[in-house]
Amino acid sequence: MPSLERLIAEVEPNVITESLTRECIQIQGGEPDTAANKKRTMPFRDVECLAFSFKNLACVDNLRGLDTLTKLQLDNNQITKIENLAHLTNLTWLDLSFNKITAISGLETLTKLVDLSLFNNQIAKIENLDTLVNLNVLSLGNNQLSQLDNVMYLRQFKQLRLVNLAGNPICKSHDYRSYVLSHIKDLIYLDYRRVNPADVQAAREQHQDEMIELQEREEQQSQEEKLNAERESHEKLMKQANLEGVETLIDDMVKEDLEWPRLSQVPSLLDPWNEIRDKFNTYTDEFKVAILEQHNKKKAEYEEWLGVVRSYLDEKDAEARKLIVEYEKAKKRTARVVVDQPLMAESQIDNLKVKLMALKDQLMAIEMEAVEVLDGLVQEFDRAYSELAEINKGQYNGYFTQVRDLQNSFFNQLTSVAMTVFEKYNQENSDIESLPEEARTLLQDKDSLMNALQASHDAHMGKIDSLEDRLVSNELRSANDLTSSNATWATKRNRDRISEIINYLERNVLELEELAGEEEGGEM
């Protein structure tokens, strides 16, 4: 007969409390007494492993402050939903076996998970695991998985080596094992059994037609992903180099030109645009090369500057540490004198006070020198970087002047062609009626045609001017922001260092007062 305690536990589910959490902390190695004391006192932020097994938990909650947790056991409880785990982003091992979970959810942020057990639950579908790219071990045995093709979902996990699906309805299919082995790559263990390479080959041959089609799709997807990655990388570089919008300028000019669709209805009117486009592409390629070269120079300039700054500060920090170490040694010697030679204690403490004041002066002198040197380095970088920004500004102005000249040339050609076309279709016996309605409207009224051409030209010039203004402003602003942030950093570094020196001084003054008090107490 079940015990009273067990019946009560089944009726009244448990909840996670601080005391329960401490009880469930797992300490690796060490003496039992030491481990027990650590469980009682260690900060939650230092806990790496928790085991809530067999605690009759109905839900997952109250795990805040355990952000460094790497292993969490929640097996053999009454949990129905995976929740409140999103902040445990350092988890590599999670056991939710033997619960009442009906759906996989709430694991999206646990991207470091390597081992996940959902064994013996009520899960009907494999889903919502896409972000767990490091998954190596997955146990979904004894659930309610009934669709064999759902196993295909696991093909995306490149690190998956051990899978357990035993005890699910899908296992009753005569194709179950061959389907899993053919569709999940590089498995080493399936349902507690080591995978035989010969079985994998036989499974792939059995599902050959499907595998060929699948591999073709994956190859196409891989190519698309590669192209997307290259495009994203290129777009990122263009943005970093302040070239965003340059490559698409000519297309954007047309896209935002309300008159362009109407003008394109007039035969041969826009033919000069092809020549303009070719010249634009040539100018743009040359411009991109120049700006990217400047971009690399700016990066190199900043990295070189950072290297000089770090090297100098490391040198000054080493100098300061040496002085502090010497003082700390003197302090230890003085402390021993207070204990061993009370009659000499007072003079030794006075000497130590003198050394402390001298140390303060030395540290302050080092810091003042550092401030002066850093100020010079910041100003030097400001000048060098601003020069590069000004060179870039000239590059932008030169490029957009070329583009404007192209647009003006196109407008002149367009006007000339428009007059020729207008005269052609306004002669007797012209076939103007065969043209689209928009074209007829333009060619029947010279003013309308010229107004449309002018509006188109204005739209193009406006787009050119707008992009130039934006890029030049970005260039100068980013240079100003960087130099300003350097100056802000230098000021904050100085304040922090002065604060460190003062705090160190005050702390040691208190220690000397305590030491003097001990000396007086010893004399009494």
Swiss-Prot record:
LRR repeats: 66-90, 92-110, 111-132, 133-155, 157-183, 250-275, 419-442
Parts forming coiled coils: 198-247, 313-372, 450-514
Alphabetized SMART domains for the sequence: LRR_SD22, LRR_TYP
Subcellular localization: Cytoplasm, Cytoskeleton, Flagellum axoneme
Database matches in Pfam families: LRR_9
Phenotype seen when the gene is deleted: Defects in DRC3 give the dc3 phenotype characterized by reduced swimming speed, increased flagellar beat frequency and abnormal flagellar waveform.
The name this protein goes by in its record: Dynein regulatory complex subunit 3
Source species: Chlamydomonas reinhardtii
Gene encoding the protein: DRC3
